[in-house]
């Protein structure tokens, strides 16, 4: 049985270091997805640097999400405050779900009986 630890990355190097060190002996692969867009839709720089985690480089599968999800709702100046907020929340959820689902692009060699953990 293999265990795959899959999660989204923003810029939490301290937490990531703890996670990798603590779980290393149990995990077959760490699948990390980083997006070029924040959940609010603003373009962002990528922060993950494999050189900070050389000890784990053979276990890390790093994926970059370089595009927005389909179905992002346009926000208009003429929208009321409540409508704008609703659209911001909806779009944020779409980005979050899309990035999380993007993890499947890094899952390889999973057999029946293996565990795939998807978390934050």
Language model features with spans:
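Short coil/turn segments at beta-strand junctions that form active-site/ligand-binding loops
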Residues: 1, 28, 111-115
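N-proximal low-complexity "stem/linker" segments adjacent to membrane-targeting elements
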Residues: 1-25
């Amino acid at each position: 049985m293999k265990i795959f630890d899959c999660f989204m990355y923003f810029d939490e190097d301290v937490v990531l270091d703890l996670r990798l060190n603590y779980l290393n002996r149990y995990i077959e692969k760490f699948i990390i997805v980083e997006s070029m867009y924040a959940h609010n839709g603003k373009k962002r720089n990528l922060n993950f640097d494999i050189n900070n985690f050389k000890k784990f480089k053979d276990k890390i599968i790093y994926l970059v999400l370089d595009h927005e999800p389909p179905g992002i709702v346009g926000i208009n100046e003429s929208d009321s405050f409540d409508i704008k907020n609703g659209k911001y929340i909806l779009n944020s959820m779409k980005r979050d779900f899309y990035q999380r689902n993007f993890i499947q692009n890094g899952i390889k060699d999973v057999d029946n009986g293996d565990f795939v953990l998807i978390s934050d």
